[in-house]
Each structure stands twice: as C-alpha cells, then as structure tokens.
C-alpha cells in the first residue's frame, strides 16, 4: 500500500535550512503517519542528523555535490563558510542537483507503488525544481522570508525599477505609489544589476520558475503581515499560505545550534555571563554568515565602544554580547575592541555559531543589532527584544523598513549596506535602550501574534493553517 510522502528541499544556507527543518517537524507532529524526506547536500545532511530523535518519520537524504566542480573551495556546501566573491557561483551551482533530484523523485515514486509524493516543497532559490515536480502535479515553492520582503524582492529583481531612474528613491511595480525604496539601501550587486549580469540572470530565472508553482508557502503570520500577504498574492497570482512562525526549538542546555551546529562558546558560560548583568542592559550583535566587511565591523566596534565608555558600570551601563562567524573576515572586528571587552568584563565575542534563541530570551538582553534576516526578525519579535537594523543584502532592507516604519520595533542604521558611521551605531543603541522602543503593551501584542500563535487551536493557528494547506494542495 502506498504511503503519503512529502519531500522538502531547502537551499544550502542556514537561513533556509532552519525554517525547512521546523516545517518538517511540524508536519511530523501533525501527520505522524506521513513520511517526510528533507533533501540537501552531504555535509548539510550530516549536520542535521543530530537534530532529529531516533525513529523519526523525518528522513534525511543527501544528493551528490562537489563544490570544487564549480571553482569553489573543497567541502563548501553552505553559505556560512563562503567568502562573498564566491557566493554567486555557489548559488548557480545549486542547479547541478537537478539530475540527482529527478532520479530521487523517480525512484521514490516507483518504490511507492508508482504513487508520486503528496507534495514537493522546494526553496524559491531552487525554482528549477518546478519544471521537474510539476510533471507530477505536485510543486509548492517555499519562501523562507516574510511576505512583505518576498513581494518587494521579487518585484525589484524581476523589473529592476531603480535602473530606470536616477532619483534616490523609486517605487517597486505592484506596490502603491506611496511605497518608496531608497537606492542607497540596495546591495552593491543589485545597484549594478541591468538584466544582463550574472546576478540578474540567476534571480530572474529562479523567481520566474517559482512563480509557475501550484502555490507558495510563506514563513509568516496572517495578522502580522496582512498587507504584505495581500501584495504577494496579487503580484504572483498564486495561492500563498502563511504557515508561520516557523521558529526553531531547542532542548534545555543544548550545546548544539538550531541546525546541528555547535556553539562557538560554551552555552553555560554565555548564560552565566548574561546572569551577571542587569535586565535589559546587554546589546546583542549578530549578523548573517556572509556580506560583512572590515569597514562595517570597525564602525560597529567603535560605535559600541563609545556608547560603553560614556556609561558608568552601574545599572545603566550597556554591555556587549557579539557573534562573529568564524569564516568571516578575520580583520573585521578590531582585536583591541575584543581585548577591551574581555578585560573589562563588559563584553564577549563569540567566534562561530551563537545560541541566539537563548540569548534573546534572557532578561539581560535589551537590544539586538541585526542584519534583519527574517529568522532573526521573527526570533527577536517573539522574545520581545527591540532591533537595530543593519541590513546588508537580499530582502533584509525591506524587513528593516517594516520593523522601523510599520511595527515601530526599533531603528535602522542610515547608510546600511554602503557603510555606516560609528556615530550612527551609538545613536541607535541609545535610541532603542533609553527610549525603550517596544512597550509592554507592544510586547504582548507581538507575543500574541508570534509566540502565542502556535499554541492556539482552530483554523487560524499554525497547525490549522498547515492542515488546510496540505488538504488543499494535495488534491
């Protein structure tokens, strides 16, 4: 007898793998008789093995991949270990998985009494999967970003409206005239895009193919992004399901990160350090694993150092807890800054992965300086920690714009992406921590939208949305 099977295929990046893994676990809980297979490259699958309990109905399957075939360093299968100049080649290498993906789906169908998977849910960065999966009438795209950010990202890459004007701001097609984007907020490669460059060709192809899907999943909450979801549905013409927040969960005192990565510093030491500081006094800083530059990190360090130096060491003093990916530019954060923080006891710098959820949940954490990746944005909101946005690339600028202007949950560093002055960092740390952006009432509102959404019952809950999605899209 054929078994119901759902295939999940995230792009090879932690920001994509984490919500896909959360989705797999949610489906597993709600549909324990289903088999769920999560596909990826060998090293990513190896890292994920520790995240699943024994006898799980979630299977991990690796597809052959050799990074050196694409001019990349050996054993580089994730953006977290990649210098930025190689990122586009890495993105493009994903399409080499097409043959292996086709063979996997064909073998799975044959082994399951010629019954194809109930659903194939693939990353929007793997838009090419639509051509293969739709032969079986079973393809759904998954945007691991929010609805607002996804809609803006799609519009800007598909139409390149900034290339048609010299003005400092512009409107994205499909958005109201009042919706303005700033040219200086765009990443360097997007500013230069003209439709014939490699970046444009990659994103326009993957987005266009994703739009041929039967439907799309978005990692968001209907009540939180009603307008963003309306725009995304209108602009794509797809059924868009808000299945979120897909937030990771960790067992207490775990030393492993959200996708099987070990913390760069003992979690117990970090928690002890946080315990030693007053509530709301710590500024947590963490960016994504790519895009950071030495100049940006120096501005950050100087700005934080000035803010720390102008405060007493008493209750009002700010503390710094930072995370620097071990593969980032080793000259990014000045050595003297790290030494000063360590010597004064007012700061720690974590090299490698940080236990972000535990840090954000701790009462000592009062602000979060972030690149505004969507996972970090959801985690910050759900833990009631205001954000200082330092967007660097992708849809991060649109997320930061929404955090500041729509939700009033923090501020954005002026000049993000193209360089930020240290004075701007100092100003925003003071703004968020002294003015206490994010009242108790707002905290409760976002906790209800995000933190409490999964606990609700009924159709509006996360589980309810998932049941409706699987029921409709598998018909």
Curated annotation (Swiss-Prot):
Annotated active site: 16, 123
UniProt catalytic activity: crocetin + UDP-alpha-D-glucose = beta-D-glucosyl crocetin + UDP; beta-D-glucosyl crocetin + UDP-alpha-D-glucose = bis(beta-D-glucosyl) crocetin + UDP; beta-D-gentiobiosyl crocetin + UDP-alpha-D-glucose = beta-D-gentiobiosyl beta-D-glucosyl crocetin + UDP
Molecular function GO labels: UDP-glucosyltransferase activity
Nucleotide-binding recorded as keyword: no
Entry-linked InterPro entries: UDP_glucos_trans (IPR002213)
Enzyme Commission no: 2.4.1.271
GO BP terms in the entry: carotenoid biosynthetic process
SUPFAM superfamilies per the UniProt record, alphabetical: UDP-Glycosyltransferase/glycogen phosphorylase (SSF53756)
SS bond list: none
UniProt entry keywords in alphabetical sequence: Carotenoid biosynthesis, Glycosyltransferase, Transferase
Residues at which an anthocyanidin binds: 16, 394
Purpose of the protein: Crocetin glucosyltransferase involved in the synthesis of crocin, one of the apocarotenoids responsible for the color and bitter taste of saffron.
Protein name, per record: Crocetin glucosyltransferase 3
């Amino acid at each position: 007898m054929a078994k119901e099977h759902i295939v999940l295929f995230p792009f090879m990046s932690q920001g994509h793998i984490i919500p896909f893994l959360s989705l797999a676990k949610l489906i597993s809980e709600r549909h324990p008789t289903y088999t769920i297979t999560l596909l990826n490259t060998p090293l990513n699958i190896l890292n994920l093995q520790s995240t699943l309990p024994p006898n799980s109905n979630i299977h991990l399957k690796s597809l052959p991949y050799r990074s050196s075939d694409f001019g990349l360093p050996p054993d580089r299968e994730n953006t977290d270990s990649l210098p930025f100049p190689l990122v586009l080649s890495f993105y493009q290498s994903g399409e080499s998985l097409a043959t292996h993906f086709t063979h996997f789906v064909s073998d799975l169908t044959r082994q399951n009494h010629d019954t194809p998977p109930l659903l194939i849910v693939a990353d929007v960065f793997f838009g090419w999967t639509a051509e293969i999966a739709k032969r079986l009438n079973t393809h759904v795209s998954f945007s691991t970003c929010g609805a607002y950010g996804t809609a803006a990202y799609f519009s800007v890459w598909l139409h390149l409206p900034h290339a048609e004007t010299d003005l400092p701001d512009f409107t994205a097609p499909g958005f109201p005239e009042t919706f303005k984007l700033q040219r200086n907020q765009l990443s360097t490669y997007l500013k230069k895009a003209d439709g014939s460059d490699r970046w444009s060709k990659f994103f326009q192809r993957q987005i266009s193919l994703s739009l041929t899907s039967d439907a799309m999943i978005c990692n968001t909450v209907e009540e939180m992004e009603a307008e963003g979801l309306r725009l995304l549905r209108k602009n794509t013409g797809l059924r868009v399901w808000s299945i979120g927040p897909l937030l990771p969960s960790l067992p207490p005192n775990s030393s492993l990160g959200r996708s099987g990565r070990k913390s760069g510093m003992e979690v117990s030491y970090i928690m002890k350090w946080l315990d030693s500081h007053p509530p709301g006094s710590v500024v947590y800083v963490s960016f994504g694993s790519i895009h950071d530059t030495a100049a940006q990190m120096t501005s950050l360090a100087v700005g934080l150092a000035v803010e720390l130096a102008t405060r007493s060491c008493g209750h009002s003093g700010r503390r710094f807890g930072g995370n620097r990916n071990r593969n980032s530019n080793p000259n990014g954060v000045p050595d003297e800054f790290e030494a000063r923080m360590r010597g004064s006891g007012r700061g720690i710098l974590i090299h490698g992965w940080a236990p972000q959820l535990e840090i954000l949940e701790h009462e000592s954490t009062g602000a979060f300086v972030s690149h505004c990746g969507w996972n970090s944005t959801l985690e910050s909101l759900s833990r009631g920690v205001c954000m200082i946005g330092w967007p660097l690339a992708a849809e991060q600028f649109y997320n930061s714009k929404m955090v500041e202007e729509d939700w009033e949950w923090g501020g954005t560093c002026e000049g993000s992406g193209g360089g930020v002055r240290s004075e701007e960092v100092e100003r925003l740390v003071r703004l968020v921590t002294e003015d206490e952006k994010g009242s108790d009432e707002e905290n409760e509102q976002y906790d209800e939208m995000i933190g409490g959404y999964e606990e609700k019952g009924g159709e509006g809950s996360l589980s309810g949305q998932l049941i409706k999605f699987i029921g409709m899209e598998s018909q």
